[in-house]
A protein has these predicted regions:
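C-terminal active-site subregion of NodB/CE4 polysaccharide deacetylases
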Residues: 1-69, 76, 107-116, 208, ...
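A short, conserved beta-to-alpha structural element at the edge of catalytic cores
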Residues: 89-115
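Solvent-exposed loop/turn segments at secondary-structure junctions
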Residues: 99-102, 220-221, 260
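Extended, charge-rich helix/loop segments that form flexible
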Residues: 105-209
Length: 323
């Protein structure tokens, strides 16, 4: 390594794939850039292995290096990420939402991603104005995107649509309109859940390969907006699901959305009551202390986009860093 590490650097990933055919506005980290980023991390920081991470959760000092984490239980993670990690002898933590495999349905948050990826923000907003105008705020407020997406490079229409569905509307309000929007975007043939997410067999395969598989809620709703009872249910359903299929709550919990506004002290209590030893959020800093000295139910993670070769690609199969 040419650069010494001073602690554990958790890094968060979502979509990692060679391309996104048919989704011209869909942001993802290209597989080529992911592999370049791994090579760069190997040179500059090194990686945290399974045993070192487990020792830290048991009370040991914070290990040095990059801790690789992957959210949402996406099909990308078994098809593309796992082979890349195995080829390099690397460890990763995979946090899985239980809803898709249990209900056979795509989560609302990913319906939004797919519709935006297919149509783009302006066309989605135009469809909403024509078909669900009653859900939209006053015209003068429609340009106000959420501060939660301030760090994203998406256009303002895309940020507004994400804010509307992920933060402003209730589950009941967004349910039917999202179904209709997705049906419109894909001309009546939207993706199937098993084409988008890990199934139970894939979860067991990750565990057999030595990866950590942990809980990431049931529906990926914003936890802080749910009742205390619903928050407890979200945590426990997810924990039970991953443990039924080779994972463990011992790998900790991962908050959906992850920003400070997305969870609350009530959420932290629910995670602790479920027996998870810690929980990951999103905050751009390293971990230098033992777990007992950290705020264990609000651990930080960096976004992979903040590092070299982390620029999002769109639609095609050419790595962003190669353009």
């Amino acid at each position: 390594m040419t650069e010494s590490a001073s602690g554990m650097k958790p890094v968060m990933y979502h979509y990692v794939r060679p391309g996104a055919e048919g989704l011209p506005h869909f942001p993802y980290l290209s597989l080529a850039d992911f592999e370049r980023q791994l090579e760069d991390f190997a040179t500059t920081h090194g990686f945290v292995g399974r045993d070192a991470f487990a020792a830290w959760t048991a009370g040991g000092p914070a290990p040095s290096g990059v801790l690789l984490t992957f959210d949402d239980g996406l099909r990308d993670h078994i098809d593309f990420v796992l082979p890349a990690l195995k080829a390099r002898g690397l460890f990763g933590l995979f946090y899985v939402s239980s809803g898709p495999a249990v209900t056979g349905r795509i989560l609302d948050v990913h319906k939004v991603h797919l519709a935006l990826g297919r149509l783009g923000g302006e066309r989605v907003l135009a469809w909403l104005e024509a078909n669900a105008a009653e859900l939209l705020p006053e015209a003068g407020m429609r340009g106000e995107s959420s501060p939660h997406y301030a760090g994203q490079v998406s256009d303002e229409a895309t940020k507004f649509v994400k804010r509307l569905f992920n933060w402003d509307l209730s589950g009941e309000e967004r349910g039917a309109v999202l179904e209709a929007l997705l049906d419109h975007a894909f001309a009546g043939s939207p993706p199937l859940w098993q084409d988008f997410y890990l199934d139970q067999q894939a979860l067991r395969e990750l565990s057999r390969a030595g990866m950590g598989v942990g809980p990431h809620s049931h529906t990926h709703a914003v936890s802080a907006e749910l009742s205390p009872q619903r928050q407890r249910e979200e945590v426990e359903l997810s924990c039970e699901f991953v443990e039924l299929h080779g994972g463990s709550r011992a790998w900790g919990y991962c908050y959906p959305h992850g920003l400070a506004a997305s969870f609350s002290p009530e959420t932290e209590r629910a995670v602790a009551a479920a027996g998870c030893p810690m929980a990951f959020a999103v905050e751009a800093r390293d971990i230098a202390a033992p777990l007992a000295e950290e705020r264990r139910y609000a651990l930080p993670r960096h976004n992979c986009n903040a590092f070299p070769h982390g620029t999002a690609s769109y639609g095609g199969d050419e790595a962003a860093s190669a353009t």
